[in-house]
Each structure stands twice: as C-alpha cells, then as structure tokens.
C-alpha cells in the first residue's frame, strides 16, 4: 500500500491549554471541519468526541490524550488532545514527546493562566514549535491585545499577532489577516463560512502598525530578508509567511490568532495556520538513539531507513484489549509483522494496526515514518519503550516519569470485588507509568499511589465505571521510609521443638548504613557452616523484615547486610527457620543501630508574578522548606526549593488563594531525608509499633 500523504503534508500536533480555556471545544471544531464528526459535541453538555471517558464527560475536563487522525486541504493531521489539569502533566509530557508542533489555546479574557505556564514550560523543554489561538473572543471581558501581552509578560516568549479581531464580546464578528491585510466576516454557523470584507476604517491604523511590527520580528529569522528590509525593500506575502514559519520551527517565535470555537468563528483560519506555519516531520531534527554497541546514531523521517518507533501510551479497550499508541520515527511497519522491543529485549508481534479517532477506529495495513498509529497485540510493551526492526536494533531516548508522591488504602466492598480489583489495578498501572499499586504486608490492605488527589480520584472512579469494582477509600497518606545510622551485629536463632520434627535456623549478621545505595547483601560464610540454600532463605527473610521496618512499620532502605556466621541442624533445619532467624537478627541489631524515620522531600518549583514573591518565600520557609534559588521569567519569579511532602497537602488551594489563581507549581520527588524528632515521634506513635 503506497503512502497516501507525503511527509511534507503531515502535521503531528497537540492542542494544549489551561483547564477551561476551550481546548476540547476547539479540537471538536477542528474534527468537524476536517470531516471526522457529523454532529458537534459541546463540552459543557458533556458530549465531546475527544473526551471519551465517562469521568471526562462528567467533569468537563480532558484526562487522557486521545489521538485522532484528520484531513485538511491535502494535509493529514494527527491530533493529540492533552489534559489541562496539573495532576495530569504526565499525559502532557508524553504527548509533547512525540509531537512536532502544538496549538496553545488561551482564554480571551484571562490570557496566560497558571497551568498554561506549566504546559508551556514542558513544551519549551521538548522544543515544540507553537502557534497560539486566543479563544473565547465572544466572552464578556475578552481582550485580544491584553492576551497577547500576557504571553510576553508571563511566559517570556516572543509573540506577535498575525490576526486582529474585529470587535469583541457579543460584537466579535470577524478578523483582519495581518499577513495578507484582508478582513473576513464570519456567519457564526457550524460550517463556519466567512466572506471577505473591507478592513474597517476604525481598525486600519492599528492593523498597519501591528503588521509593521510583525514584519520587523519575522525578518530576523531570514538573513536575506533582513538585509532587504533594512535596505527599505518591500517584503512580499510569501516571503513574510516563510520567515514566520522559520521563527515558529525554531520554537522561538509564536504567532497569535483569534477566534471563538464555541461560536464557530476562526477555526478554519486556525487550520490554515497549522498547515502554513507548524512543521512537518521533515522540518524537525532527527531523533537520536543508542545502538547495542553504545554508539549514538540518528534516525530520520525516511521510509527506507530501518523501522523505529516510540510507544507513548498504553490503554485497555473493553472490546479490543490492550492498545499501544506509537510514533514512527523511521521506516515502515506492516500489520502481522514482528518487532523488537529493544527497551525490554523482547520480540513482539503486531496483530493489527489501527488509526484512531477519539474512541472509534479504522484498520490499516501499514504505517509510515512520521506517522502516529495504534497497535493491537503487543503484550509486554509499556509507555516509553522503543520498538524497532530486529536487524536495526536501536534504543530511542525514553521518557522519564516522576515518582508517585501520594498514596491511599483501598478495600474491596465484597469478595467478588476483591478478585476484580486486582485485575483492574494491574491494567490501570500498565496504562499509567505514574500510578503504582502494592499490598501492605502488615495490614494486608491494597495501597494505590499517584501524582495527586485528583489523579487517585479518577483511578478509583475508573475502577467503578470500567471494571465494576466497588471500593472503600482511605485518607491520602505520605510514603515514609526507615533507615539505620550506625552499624550493628546480632545473632538470630530460631529453635522450635514440638514433638516429632522441629525447626532450626541460626545466623549471625552484620548491618551497616548504605546511604543512597539501597539494600546490599554480602555472603561471608566459610567452611559450609550454612548451606547456600539456607543463606538464600535468610536473605529472603531479611528482605521481608526490612519491608516492614523496625520502628514505624515503613520499608527500611539503604542497608548493607553481611552474613558472617551461623549453624545448621542435620534434621531440623528448614527454609522458614532461616527466614525467621534473619528477621530476629535485624530486630536485635536495631537496638544498637539508631533507626530513624525518613520523609520524602520534594523538588518544588513555584512560579508567581513578582508581587507575590515575598509571600511565597515566607510560605515555603514556614513549611520547613529550603529555598535553593529563584530566576526571573518575564514578569514572574520561579522559586526553586526542597520541601517535605507532609507539608504540601492542600498546597494547590493555598497557593491559589494568596495569588488569586496566578501562581502555579510543580512538585517532583527528590530524595528521602531524616524527619525531625517531633514529627518522627508522631509517626511512630501513630504506627502503634
């Protein structure tokens, strides 16, 4: 099957925004105009095409990046809809990783909002070219020029309008195209027809000034044009478009458009801008990867190169099973073929290849370089894995996901729920690399851990809706740890005689702190005093005991254990006895080793307008935080600090209240550190150990 659309006519784009900026509605309109939807779904009615999970429709927010393919003016779009809530930044991260460009949607009344800053920073990290769509121009208080200004002030980004709205609020009727100096009036119907009109006289001067500024900014990206401009030459429309495109592809310049997706105004012109200014897979740098020899190589968007792709999302579909979304960087993949998962060194068979539209799908025979598709049949592939040709093995740069920072206990309501719950949790953990689940050895409770309270709410909700599992949910908890500060040596001897065959296990173990190196086991038994089998049992027993700690019931980390002596009984020795003996040795030695409670310390980055800088610094210090520095970004300050997680519960609400919603923060696990005595005593008391 031949390639239907050339690489030049392919756009892999994301739609990114603050929650409630109208991103999903904008995506809806794009899908409507590109022929994928016959009836438009309104987000505020809970009927959107992209928001296909039940909770998304109920809450009116986008949680999962739904990938969809659409077509516009001989160009094929692969669109990824990204969530706008801070608990789902991992979804944004993984979609940005595989995109070539993005449309940033702003609210015409608010301009750049806190979550816009978070998502914008992530896009900047991945050097994603962007165009900006100022949406909701029909809204009361909408102000296009103010919104453009916030891009420079709050994001420190170089932006300039390429359109000027005609009117605002209920009088928003059309736009002036500043590149071609033409004006268009919208009819406001779903088909979004528009007609060319004269540029209104009251806006002509402003339009000329904005165009002159646009030309000045754009020619900087083309040396020949800059010389022509400085010599007083006239810059043609095609030259201006080409210069704007260069600035956009450099991820250095961000053209701004205006519209109202809800009122069917400006979305078709936005689609034209995606084609004109956002990059094709050929415009972006080739991807780097590592060969089995360790040598770094590049793979290009070329069908003749060996196949290489990155899995960026895994989902469970109730009808098809496991779906793996992947971006092809080089080569071609045919359905039914075998690929190598080079990250896990496992061979996988691609059963079917699907092209997705929200939650509908079309089966295709082949997928080409530069494209995004979904595979059915990959059993062991997870998010961030590289898929490649067996003969052209390569590992592409993967995605790094933050550790979960919040956990809570789940209990199934009935016996039937118990069985379904473990299946549901393993499937959900497979989909989401920032979600973990395990069983607490002491209480037997199932613990789930994730990125925030909303994140875990959604997980519990999905279990109920998709897997029909009813649960009782505990309060959120911090994941503490324990460690030792001094070395210690102890004997563990377990002898049990109860008529007939007894039990005998005897070990001597030396313990010492092993900072930042995890658990280490060393065998120094000589002369066969304890057999290898029982030494291994002692190790297993010790690891089990460490999982439950010695002072507060939390896992003990960073311990080196050396087994130095022991003995065996020719009849009564058994594996269980050595497991118990090792745990007895730990308990005994802990009396000398000064065990302590460790608490998780988070890297917290808070970005706030300058006027709130002092308040935030004081607030962080009051939370036992250590300020590591700050940097100016536009008219905002980003404060970097390390803060104990215990102090961060409810921080989103706190920050919102004293910055009027203009502050935002990111929080990622840094390390474990010893908890102050008063806090440790409280934790130990609560544990009842």
Curated annotation (Swiss-Prot):
One of its GO terms (cellular component) is cytoplasm. It is found in: Cytoplasm. Residues 8-282 form the tr-type G domain. Transmembrane segments: none annotated. CDD domains: EF-G, EFG_III, EFG_mtEFG1_IV, EFG_mtEFG_C, EFG_mtEFG_II. InterPro entries: EF-G-like_DII (IPR053905), EFG_II (IPR041095), EFG_III (IPR009022), EFG_III/V (IPR035647), EFG_IV (IPR047872), EFG_V (IPR035649), EFG_V-like (IPR000640), G_TR_CS (IPR031157). The keyword GTP-binding applies. Keywords: Cytoplasm, Elongation factor, GTP-binding, Nucleotide-binding, Protein biosynthesis. GTP binds at residues 17-24, 81-85, 135-138. Gene3D superfamilies: 3.30.230.10, 3.30.70.240, Elongation Factor G (Translational Gtpase), domain 3, P-loop containing nucleotide triphosphate hydrolases, Translation factors. One of its GO terms (biological process) is ribosome disassembly. It holds the Pfam family GTP_EFTU. GO terms for molecular function: GTP binding; GTPase activity; translation elongation factor activity. Belongs to the TRAFAC class translation factor GTPase superfamily. Classic translation factor GTPase family. EF-G/EF-2 subfamily. PANTHER family: RIBOSOME-RELEASING FACTOR 2, MITOCHONDRIAL, TRANSLATION ELONGATION FACTOR G-RELATED. Catalyzes the GTP-dependent ribosomal translocation step during translation elongation. During this step, the ribosome changes from the pre-translocational (PRE) to the post-translocational (POST) state as the newly formed A-site-bound peptidyl-tRNA and P-site-bound deacylated tRNA move to the P and E sites, respectively. Catalyzes the coordinated movement of the two tRNA molecules, the mRNA and conformational changes in the ribosome. This is Elongation factor G.
